[in-house]
Amino acid sequence: MVEDVELNRLYWHSRRGMLELDVLLVPFVREVYPHLNDVDRDLYRRLLTCEDQDMFGWFMQRAESEDAELQRMVRMILDRVQPK
């Protein structure tokens, strides 16, 4: 189980100040992050260390991360909001 302190910290780190990222990351950390396994939680925290401009390109699907694991997390976040 994820502690409230950790979730609150991640919530604030997920708020990037760029609306396009905020609408993806904030709901993800609230709704999905608590149910992730430890590996994916670490991966999400690593994603948050990336530059906003890089993440913007990845989430707008203009580019892909050179790191396959980070790209997998990007895809996981996008898959929850895109119609199937």
From Swiss-Prot:
Identify the keywords attached in UniProt to this record, alphabetized. Answer: Chaperone, Cytoplasm
Q: Does the keyword Lyase apply?
A: no
For this protein, the record's InterPro entries field holds: SDH (IPR005631), SDH_sf (IPR036714), SdhE_FAD_assembly_factor (IPR050531)
Q: Which GO terms describe its biological process?
A: succinate metabolic process
Keyword Nucleotide-binding on entry: no
Any idea where this protein resides? Cytoplasm
* Leader sequence segment: none
Q: Name one GO cellular component term.
A: cytoplasm
Coarse class of the protein's main subcellular location: cytoplasm
Q: What does this protein do?
A: An FAD assembly protein, which accelerates covalent attachment of the cofactor into other proteins. Plays an essential role in the assembly of succinate dehydrogenase (SDH, respiratory complex II), an enzyme complex that is a component of both the tricarboxylic acid cycle and the electron transport chain, and which couples the oxidation of succinate to fumarate with the reduction of ubiquinone (coenzyme Q) to ubiquinol. Required for flavinylation (covalent attachment of FAD) of the flavoprotein subunit SdhA of SDH and other flavinylated proteins as well.
The UniProt entry's sequence similarity note says: Belongs to the SdhE FAD assembly factor family.
UniProt protein name: FAD assembly factor SdhE
What organism is the protein native to?
Pseudomonas syringae pv. tomato (strain ATCC BAA-871 / DC3000)
